[in-house]
Amino acid sequence: MKLLQAVHLTAGWDEKYPARDMGNGKIRSVGMAMAMQGSGITCVDVGSATLKLNDEGIYTLSISSADMGTGCDTILAQIAAEVLMCPLENISVIAADTDATPYDSGSYASSTTYVTVEKTALGLITKIKAFGANMLKCSIDDVDFDGKSVINMHTNESVSLNDIAVSSMCGATQSLQHTESNSMPSSPPPFMAGMVEIELDKE
């Protein structure tokens, strides 16, 4: 409704509708159209991502969305880096290889970005905190993660991300990686409106 009101005011609709007689056999009139495009369609569109902590303390982000000019490889890496509190160069992206990367229903419009990678990064942080807490011999509730270390908030003892990475890979315990998928419970409705003014020769 706000979009239609904005078009209505910008176009001077009230002064031009339904038509103005130009006095030379011609009239001027206006028309308006509105459309909606499906994006993040419920029960159809799904995005998935996997983040893995490697033994050198950097991350691999695996996605199946193809960068067709949207910049999604960079954008999704930036989102992961922001959540994980690390430099962008610490995120290595493997993209659009559906034999190796988690399922994604496609890259189009701007619906590729945001939700899944954030969820994946937050899930990986939880696993990093749990692993770090185990190394510090305390509860996960006692620790925090600052992007470089897991810190016991009560004793200020810490274990570095690099040590966690090496221990998880080489200590016969577990590889630290996390996968998430996201699909919208309802479709967000991207919409657009436009107005045209025409001059018509009635004859």
Identify the function of each model-found stretch.
Residues 1-84, 96-203:
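Cofactor-centric catalytic regions
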Residues 91:
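Short conserved active-site loop signatures built around small residues
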